[in-house]
Every structure is written in structure tokens, then in C-alpha cells.
Design a protein with these regions (language model features):
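Short acidic/polar hinge/loop motifs at secondary-structure boundaries
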Residues: 61, 187-222
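Conserved small-residue
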Residues: 261, 265-278, 666-672, 686-764, ...
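Extracytoplasmic beta-strand/coil segments of soluble accessory domains associated
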Residues: 142-188, 217, 227-247
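Flexible loop and strand-edge segments within Gram-negative outer membrane beta-barrel domains
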Residues: 264, 291-313, 317-324, 328-398, ...
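Extracytoplasmic gating/loop element in the C-terminal half of outer-membrane beta-barrel translocons
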Residues: 267, 791-882, 887
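Short, acidic, small-residue-rich periplasmic hinge/interaction motif at the N-terminus
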Residues: 31-35, 42-45, 73-77, 88-131, ...
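Surface-exposed loop/turn segments flanking beta-strands in extracellular/periplasmic regions
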Residues: 273-281, 362-384, 428-445, 485-513, ...
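N-terminal periplasmic "start-of-domain" segments of outer-membrane beta-barrel proteins
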Residues: 49-59, 107-134, 161-165, 193-200, ...
Length: 939
């Protein structure tokens, strides 16, 4: 017995000593494979459960047994696994920046984020942090335009703070409300533009408050096939913005990470005017606009799985139009905590802005019109009067959310998000006393106070079920309550006795107040099936209810279905979905106004006739696509889609003889659309880790056609909605011949003879558009990149030149023709040719609907990474440093004769009742060329 005990004890000691001998503590270092810089906070885990984080030098220590595997991962890098057999003390492990595109987490629906390989639709993900590291961006359009297939977006004109026009896929809708829904960290963002004290073209964009430097990534959901889960307003797609926050991958006892980014830039007129007899006053009117930006962040992890992120952004941007300036301060605080089954995230950001938006277009008293129309400038208003006026908006905006997640018993995951967006804006227009504007030299002052707010509360429950071997089902149920409320009161005062700041002293005053409220409730159910991580099937159904008047608006259903199948290097996807657009708030309401007083009391008369049976517009979309990965370096994507819009709202004119004025809405419109999207990005050249060349390109084709208008055309000439033609087509009389007097001389009053019929003259959307560019790295430290945008097939109504040709004397082409005509002999072939040419420069709409094809070098950037030198000189106090220089809107090649082929006279897209207009150049301010130098460093 004693002998057996001694033998057992000896064996135990021997095995223990062998185990201790087999397990050793290894030390290694993790670096960026391309730059050699240490990666701080990388997660190192072994197959037996041991974990470690890399320190400030990228080092870690971990006990390992023989034949174990360790995995090293860090956000933004491809994870790497190493077997302990090949592990050596002091070895250096390099992580490759970037991750497999199919593994990128993107917003799949309102209820979930999934890897791209699980998506049946083409949802595009943009890593904004990476983009803004090399190039400067002032607006959302600078980031997304040209980088997302099937999407075209640009500012309506070249001033600071202007609205953005969105062209999403085929644009198969009659509605002027063409903006996508925008979410920021789960907050439904209010996108209403503000034009309370100026014209719609010079409106203040709601997107001006977006914190560009704070954006980490953007997911773009382009159509109903993917956006059906977002309900009744998602036909234009959804843009999901995720802002920066702290990371759980950093050590608790690490010092706070501090990042600073400083930019200094200048904007100037990109294309000088040469289309006029006297160009100097117009070219000299524009000035250099200086731009300053300071951005700083502090992030820190704390004990107990907590982290905090703080940022501050100062933006001071001047435009090229005198007086156009945007001064904005933004602060943001984000907090995250994970404790067992509970996770809590909260975000609060505050924007204080002051922007001056001088009015330069849309009226006879505006600057560009007065500089363009006549050879002698300022015919309708004195320059001193225009410069004395001021249009300013002061706005304060708060964005806040709280997100809670909890894992209930039974593996049910419960999540809720509450989001708030509150924007208060005060607009003030001033015409000082003593300056003559029209017939008023006694001053004017308009004041508006607006409060736009949005609230959303989302709550969802989800659970994963194992159906069979390799088969899994995730079921989700989500409820969303949303409220949008807008109120504005305004007072317009004029004709003072002196100081215009005392509104009570005005002899003419007008007060107005308007409110708008929209409440919606959506219930969304989703079933997501996963087979062997290769086949993914997603089915969803959304039911929406709204407070808008109308029996058919109270309850609406939107289904969706998608399938994705993955091979080793290729994915096939198919998706179908439905969404829509809600009617205008007053479409279902019949209203009357008081007409007087009778012996029996007040009398009323009809004002607007509503349609209580009005339905939301419905868009159905199906898309098919495939994605390839070739040689692990090249990624290609091809998507084909078709859209079918029914119940489009057409406004039929009412007969005044029936006692009504205006129009009544009816669901009689139908439109079809289709398109193709092709994208490529790849690493086409790499030499060790010092040199590389990345190339990207996308090509998009889109078309739409109106198939029903209820039997009548809807016109806002030269834009029309007409069966058989694209929506908002240009459709008008054409010029047939010149106008001659009986003696053979040119009739300058008539100008030309128009055709009696109408003809199709173009459309406001390009048939083909896209972008291409490259990013080059040399010697590890030097970067050089470009982005080119192009479009073919769109037209623009050049209303600026149309008016100048007939109402002024400054259009050079026509002026030269008139001069040549005066020197020619009546009745000669030369005279007849010049007279015929004059017919096509006369003030007729068809003469000024122009092709607007273009190729634009949108961005050119170069940078140098000083990290190694900075670390050496500061003893690692500065952990990274980069200097970059970028130029935006370098040049454009176009067949459009106006200031810029990408302008929008109505100020972008907006909510309005009835047909509007698209692609009109109404003395729009041109887009500037911008130069920006940026220095960024991390402590």
C-alpha cells in the first residue's frame, strides 16, 4: 500500500514537471505590416482561453503549451493565427491593414448589422475614417459622391451650407421629395432644409450640421429591395451614419489616446466666366474664401469594460461669394459599458452654428443676376445696397441617443434605442435704413424662429434557433415609434423711421406661424436563415401606421425577401422589397376659408379640395447581383435592378366654375425604372510593404419611364410628367427657323419662329455616371490619390443665359452675332446664315436646354507619414503624425456652357405639393476649387 502511494506520488510529480516544462511564456511584438509601427491594444487569445493585450510598444506575453494556436486581432486589420510550434520568443507578427470586404459588418436592415456575405442586396459600406485620413471633406457629398454605385449627389450651388441633390438609382418617382432617410447612431435625422428668410435655392441645408470629422463609417441602402424594413418613406433609400467612439480593445490602465487634426484651406473661383461681353465684374465679384478646421478627440478605457470618447470640432469656412461664411462648433461625448448580459451606450452631441447666406440668385435684386445680365453691371440694384443686406441663421442642434442591450434567459436578446434630434434656428434678414431696394429705402427686417425636432424609439427582441445540423434561424421583432415636429413663426417688417432693429417702429408688418407634425409607428418582423455560413435567406414584413389624414394612410404593409449564396470566391444575391412615400400632409384634407359675414354668421368659400382615399406612393424593387474576389486582391460587383412605382400622386386641376381652386391629388401615376451597377476595387501592384497601388472604379446605368399619368400631362415647362418619357423630361416647342421682316431684315423682336408641336429635349438625370481613381503608396510614407467623376446623358435648362439673351445685352455669343449681322448685307447668304444662327440664341427655352456631360477631377491628394520621425524626436510621445495636401474640384471638362454642369435651381430636393422642377441653372453660384493642408497627430 505504501509502495503504491510512493509510486503514484512520483508519477504525479513527474507529469507536473513535464507539464510545466511544456508550457512556456512567450513574448512577441505586433506591428502594422505595411508601416512597421506597433499596434497598441491588439487582442491576443490562445486556444486554451488565455488572453492578452499588446502594450504601447506592441508587445505581449502569453503562456503557451505545445501545439496551441494563438489569434491576434485588431479593428481595421486582417486577423492572423500562429501555431505555437512556429512561435519564437521576441518574434514580430505583422497584421495587414484592411479586412475581407465580405466580412465587413454593414447595416442589413433596421433590425440588424451583418457581414456583407450574408446580404442579398447591394448595401455599400464606406470607411470614412480611412478616407478623411488622406483627403479633406466639407460635406456628405464630398465623401459619398462617386464612391457608391447608383448614387449621385452634389450641392445645389457653390456657396457654403447649400442643400444636396440626391439621385438614387433610376429615380422612378414623380415626387420632389427625393432625399434618403438618414440615421446617425440610431437617431432619425431631420433633413428639412430651411429657407425662412431667403429663396429655396439659397436654403440652409439640414445636413450642414453633420459632424463630418466625427463620422467613422457610412452604410448606403439604395432602394426598397434593401430598405423595406425602414417603412413608408424609404423608397429613396437610407443612409446609416456611424460616428467615432471609444474601443474595448485598449487596456484599462493605458493613458488616454489623444488625436488632433488641423486644416487650413482656401477656396477660389474654379472656372472664370468667358461667356459674356463684360466678364470682369462677375469674375471680380468672387473672392478667396479662407477655411480653418480644428478637430480633437480624447478616448479612454476604464476598469469594468467601460470606455469614453470626447471630440471637439471648430469649423470656420468662408465661401467665394462675399459675406458667405459658416462658423460652427461641435462637441460630442460617447460612453459605453459592458457588464455581463448588459450593454449600455450613450451619445450626446451639440452643434452651435452661425452662417451667413447672401442671396445671389432667383431674383432681379440678387448679385449674380445683376452682374450677368447687362454689360453695365448692377442695373436693378446698387452694389452698395446688395452688400449692405445680410441674411444670417443662428442654429443650435442637439443629437442624443441611449442604446440598451440585455441577454434575457432563454438566449433572447433585447435591445432598445431612443434617439432625439432637436434643432432651433433663428433667421434674420436686414436691409438697413437709407438703402434703396425696389421702391423701399426705409429699411426692412425679417425674423424667423424655427424649431425642428425628431424623436424615435426602437425596441427589438431577437433569438437564434438551431434548426438542424448547419441550419440556424434568427427571429427578430422590432417596434419603432417616430415623431417629427416642426414649428416656425416669422415677422416681416419694412419702412422704418430709422433703426431697423426696432421692429415695433415699422409701418408695415406681417406675422405668420406654421406647424407640422408627423407620427408613425412601424412593426417589423424578420426571419434570417443561415445554412453552413454559405446560404443566407432573409424574409421580413413591415407594417406602418401614420397620423396623416386619410383612410389608406393609417395602415400599410411592406414585404421583403433576399437570398445570398457564397462560393469560395464568389457570391450570388437576389432581393425583393417594397417601400413608398407618404402623401403631402394636406392631401387628404378639404379646407375652407372665411369669406365674409352674413346675417346668419360667417360665410366660407372653398380653399383646397382633399382626397380622403389618397394612398402612399408604392415602389417595388427587385435586384440581382454577384460579387467576385480574384486572387485575394481584386473585388468586383455587378448589380441589375428594376423598379416599379404605382399609386404615384398626380395633382389634377379643378374647375373654378365648380367653386374650387387649385388641384386634387389622385393615385393614378405609374413609373418604371431599371439600371445596372458595376464596381471594382483592387490592389493592382505591391512591392514588399513599401509600395502599393490601389485602383477603384464604378459605372452606373439608369433609366426610367412614365407609364401612366391618368390621361393628362403634368407640366411645369419645360419640365413635364408625360406618358412614355422620363420623369421631369424637358419637353417644349423647338425653334424651326429665323424670324425675318418683309424686307428680309432680321426681326430682333420675334427672334425666331417656334414649332407648333412639342418635342422631347432631354432629361435631368444622367444615363451613365460613375467614378474612378487610385491610391498610390511609395516608400511606406508617401501617399498620392485621385478621384474622377463623370456623367453622360443629362441635360440642364440654362435659365441664366435664357434670361440674359432676351432681357439683357451681355451674352457674348448673341452679341457677336448681332454685331456680325450689322456688318453684313441684307439678302446675301452671309446675312441669312447669321440671321439663322441668331434664331438659335434668341430667348426661347429650347435654345437653352443643354447637354451637361462632364468629366471632373474631383479630388487630388498627396500625403507624407512622419510617424517614425515624430516618435523618434519625441521619445514616443507622439505616436503618429501625417501631413497631407488636397485639392477639390481641380478641373472639369464639359459641353455645358454655363457655370457648372452640376447645379440645381430649386435648392436640391424638397417636400412640396405637386410637380416642381429639376436641373435648372438660375444664376447659380459656381462650385469653387478648394485647396486644403492638413496636419494630424496622435498622442
Amino acid at each position: 500500500m505504501q509502495l503504491n502511494f510512493k509510486r503514484s506520488l512520483a508519477l504525479l510529480l513527474l507529469s507536473t514537471s513535464m507539464s510545466v516544462y511544456a508550457q512556456q511564456t512567450y513574448t512577441a511584438r505586433v506591428v502594422n505590416q505595411e508601416t512597421g509601427e506597433p499596434i497598441i491594444g491588439a487582442i491576443v487569445s490562445s486556444s486554451n482561453g488565455e488572453k492578452a493585450l499588446t502594450d504601447a510598444q506592441g508587445r505581449f506575453s502569453l503562456p503557451l503549451n505545445e501545439n496551441q494556436t494563438i489569434r491576434i486581432s485588431y479593428l481595421g486589420f486582417t486577423p492572423q493565427s500562429v501555431n505555437s510550434k512556429s512561435f519564437r520568443n521576441g518574434m514580430v507578427i505583422g497584421l495587414i491593414p484592411g479586412i475581407d470586404l465580405q466580412e465587413v459588418k454593414v447595416t442589413a436592415s433596421i433590425s440588424s448589422a451583418r457581414s456583407k456575405k450574408a446580404l442579398g442586396s447591394n448595401v455599400e459600406h464606406v470607411d470614412v475614417s480611412k478616407l478623411t485620413a488622406n483627403e479633406h471633406a466639407n460635406s456628405l457629398s464630398d465623401i459619398l459622391d462617386g464612391r457608391v454605385g447608383g448614387v449621385q449627389m452634389y450641392q445645389s450651388n457653390g456657396k457654403v451650407g447649400m442643400p444636396i441633390r440626391f439621385n438614387m438609382r433610376s429615380g422612378a418617382t414623380i415626387s420632389m421629395d427625393r432625399d434618403p432617410i438618414i440615421y446617425v447612431d440610431g437617431i432619425k435625422y431631420n433633413t428639412s432644409h430651411i429657407s425662412d428668410i431667403n429663396s429655396s435655392q439659397d436654403a440652409l441645408s439640414a445636413l450642414n450640421d453633420l459632424p463630418i470629422e466625427d463620422i467613422a463609417s457610412i452604410d448606403v441602402i439604395k432602394g426598397p429591395s434593401a430598405a423595406a424594413s425602414y417603412g413608408a418613406e424609404a423608397a429613396n433609400g437610407v443612409i446609416v451614419i456611424t460616428t467615432k467612439r471609444g474601443s474595448f480593445n485598449t487596456k484599462e490602465n493605458n493613458k488616454a489616446a489623444i488625436q488632433v487634426k488641423m486644416s487650413l484651406g482656401a477656396a477660389s473661383l474654379a472656372r472664370k466666366y468667358n461667356q459674356f461681353v463684360n466678364n470682369d465684374p462677375l469674375n471680380n465679384f468672387f473672392e478667396t474664401g479662407w477655411q480653418k478646421n480644428l478637430y480633437g478627440t480624447v478616448s479612454k478605457s476604464f476598469r469594468g469594460n467601460q470606455n469614453m470618447f470626447f471630440s471637439y470640432n471648430m469649423n470656420d469656412v468662408e465661401g467665394i461669394v462675399p459675406g458667405n461664411r459658416d462658423q460652427r462648433h461641435t462637441t460630442k461625448l460617447a460612453y459605453d459599458i459592458k457588464s455581463g448580459p448588459l450593454s449600455v451606450s450613450a451619445t450626446a452631441s451639440y452643434v452651435h452654428g452661425n452662417i451667413s447666406l447672401p442671396q445671389t440668385a432667383m431674383g432681379r435684386y440678387d448679385a449674380i443676376w445683376n452682374l450677368m445680365i447687362n454689360q453695365t453691371p448692377w442695373p436693378y440694384v446698387e452694389e452698395s445696397t446688395w452688400r449692405a443686406q445680410s441674411w444670417t441663421y443662428n442654429n443650435d442642434r442637439f443629437l442624443g441617443n441611449i442604446r440598451l442591450g440585455y441577454l434575457l434567459p432563454g438566449a433572447v436578446k433585447l435591445e432598445t434605442v431612443i434617439g432625439v434630434d432637436v434643432n432651433s434656428t433663428k433667421g434674420v434678414y436686414r436691409l438697413p435704413y437709407g438703402y434703396l431696394l425696389g421702391n423701399n429705402n426705409e429699411g426692412a427686417k425679417n425674423v424667423s424662429n424655427r424649431r425642428n425636432s425628431s424623436f424615435n424609439w426602437d425596441i427589438k427582441a431577437s433569438r437564434r434557433f438551431k434548426l438542424a445540423d448547419k441550419w440556424n434561424l434568427t427571429a427578430t421583432l422590432l417596434s419603432q415609434i417616430a415623431r417629427q415636429y416642426e414649428t416656425v413663426n416669422a415677422i416681416n417688417a419694412s419702412r422704418f423711421k430709422g433703426d431697423v432693429d426696432n421692429i415695433a417702429a415699422a409701418t408695415e408688418r406681417n406675422v405668420s406661424e406654421n406647424t407640422f407634425e408627423q407620427r408613425t409607428w412601424g412593426l417589423y418582423g424578420e426571419a434570417f436563415v443561415n445554412y453552413d455560413n454559405r446560404l443566407f435567406i432573409n424574409a421580413g414584413l413591415r407594417r406602418d401606421a401614420s397620423n396623416l389624414i386619410g383612410s389608406n394612410v393609417a395602415s400599410i404593409y411592406y414585404p421583403s425577401l433576399s437570398v445570398a449564396y457564397n462560393l469560395e470566391n464568389q457570391k450570388f444575391r437576389l432581393a425583393y422589397g417594397e417601400s413608398g412615400r407618404l402623401p403631402y400632409p394636406t392631401d387628404a384634407r378639404t379646407s375652407y376659408v372665411m369669406d365674409g359675414i352674413s346675417a346668419y354668421g360667417p360665410t366660407v368659400k372653398p380653399q383646397f379640395k382633399g382626397n380622403p382615399n389618397i394612398r402612399p406612393e408604392r415602389m417595388r424593387e427587385i435586384e440581382f447581383g454577384t460579387d467576385w474576389t480574384l486572387a485575394k486582391r481584386h473585388n468586383l460587383s455587378l448589380t441589375l435592378y428594376a423598379q416599379y412605382t404605382s399609386d404615384a400622386i398626380i395633382y389634377e386641376n379643378l374647375l373654378s366654375s365648380d367653386g374650387w381652386i387649385g388641384s386634387i391629388p389622385r393615385n393614378v401615376g405609374r413609373i418604371k425604372g431599371h439600371g445596372i451597377e458595376f464596381g471594382y476595387n483592387g490592389l493592382v501592384w505591391k512591392d514588399t510593404n513599401k509600395h502599393s497601388l490601389d485602383v477603384y472604379a464604378n459605372v452606373n446605368y439608369q433609366a426610367n419611364k412614365v407609364t401612366d399619368t391618368g390621361g393628362s400631362d403634368i407640366t411645369n415647362y419645360p419640365n413635364v410628367i408625360k406618358k412614355g418619357y422620363p420623369v421631369y423630361s424637358f419637353y417644349y416647342h423647338t425653334v424651326e427657323k429665323t424670324a425675318l421682316n418683309a424686307d428680309g431684315t432680321y426681326n430682333t423682336k420675334m427672334g425666331a419662329v417656334e414649332s407648333s408641336d412639342y418635342k422631347y429635349l432631354g432629361k435631368p438625370f444622367p444615363a451613365v455616371n460613375g467614378s474612378f481613381g487610385f491610391n498610390l503608396k511609395l516608400f511606406s510614407n508617401i501617399t498620392f490619390g485621385t478621384k474622377w467623376n463623370y456623367a453622360l446623358g443629362a441635360s440642364v435648362y440654362n435659365q441664366s443665359f435664357y434670361n440674359t439673351a432676351g432681357l439683357g445685352d451681355n451674352l457674348k455669343k448673341r452679341n457677336d452675332q448681332l454685331t456680325a449681322l450689322a456688318n453684313a448685307t441684307v439678302g446675301t447668304p452671309e446675312y441669312e446664315k447669321i440671321a439663322n444662327d441668331l434664331a438659335y440664341t434668341a430667348r426661347f427655352r429650347a435654345n437653352y436646354i443643354e447637354k451637361a456631360d462632364f468629366l471632373r477631377l474631383s479630388n487630388l491628394n498627396v500625403g507624407y507619414d512622419f510617424t517614425s520621425l515624430a516618435r523618434k524626436l519625441t521619445n514616443n510621445t507622439i505616436t503618429s503624425m501625417k501631413l497631407s495636401f488636397s485639392v477639390q474640384n481641380v478641373f472639369v471638362i464639359t459641353n455645358y456652357s454655363g457655370a457648372d454642369p452640376q447645379v440645381e435651381g430649386n435648392g436640391g430636393n424638397r417636400k412640396q405639393r405637386g410637380i416642381g422642377s429639376l436641373s435648372r441653372d438660375i444664376t447659380n453660384a459656381p462650385h469653387p476649387r478648394t485647396y486644403t493642408a492638413t496636419l494630424s497627430f496622435t498622442l
